[in-house]
From Swiss-Prot:
Gene Ontology CC terms, in alphabetical order: cytosol
UniProt-recorded Gene Ontology molecular function terms: RNA binding
Family: Belongs to the NusB family.
The organism's place on the tree of life at top rank: Bacteria
NCBIfam families: nusB
Record protein name field: Transcription antitermination protein NusB
Keywords in alphabetical order: RNA-binding, Transcription, Transcription antitermination, Transcription regulation
PANTHER family: ANTITERMINATION NUSB DOMAIN-CONTAINING PROTEIN, N UTILIZATION SUBSTANCE PROTEIN B-RELATED
Keyword hit for Chaperone: no
GO terms for biological process, alphabetical: DNA-templated transcription termination; transcription antitermination
Biological role: Involved in transcription antitermination. Required for transcription of ribosomal RNA (rRNA) genes. Binds specifically to the boxA antiterminator sequence of the ribosomal RNA (rrn) operons.
Primary gene name: nusB
Length: 135
């Protein structure tokens, strides 16, 4: 199964959920019905989506602490989606190296976010990693 592609799909679904306010189950089911799903790790995708949903307050507080002077409400929806995924992986998915989460998030930002957002995303994630290591 392709983790990189699964991470990209998870990001797209998380973004869709943030816009449409549909349930995780409905969003995943709709995706499966309308897209090619071969080589996707839906166990990982669902774990990420549910984990972020269940830990949103904690994740957002960590992002806000790490984004120096930026409130969550000021961060674009796509950037906050990418940051939430990276933060979830950093704090809750201990089998995923922090550097992998950081690199994948920066690549997603380069592909989907505003032109120079990847540097903002990279800086926030660096701070998230540092705060996770302080525990």
């Amino acid at each position: 199964m392709n983790r990189k592609k699964s991470r990209e799909v998870a990001m797209k679904l998380l973004f869709e959920i943030s816009i449409n306010k549909n349930s995780i189950s409905d969003t995943i089911e709709h995706y499966k019905e309308n897209n090619e799903i071969e080589n996707l790790d839906f166990e990982y995708i669902e774990r990420i989506l549910r984990g972020i949903d269940e830990n949103m307050e904690y994740i957002d507080s960590k992002i806000e602490e790490s984004s120096k002077k930026w409130k969550i409400s000021r961060i674009s929806k796509i950037n906050i989606t990418i940051l939430r995924m990276a933060a979830y992986e950093i704090f809750f998915e201990k089998d995923i190296p922090c550097k992998v989460s950081a690199n994948e998030a920066v690549e997603l930002a380069k592909s989907y976010a505003e032109e120079n957002s990847f540097s903002f995303v990279n800086g926030v994630i660096g701070n998230l990693i540092n705060s996770s290591e302080e525990k």
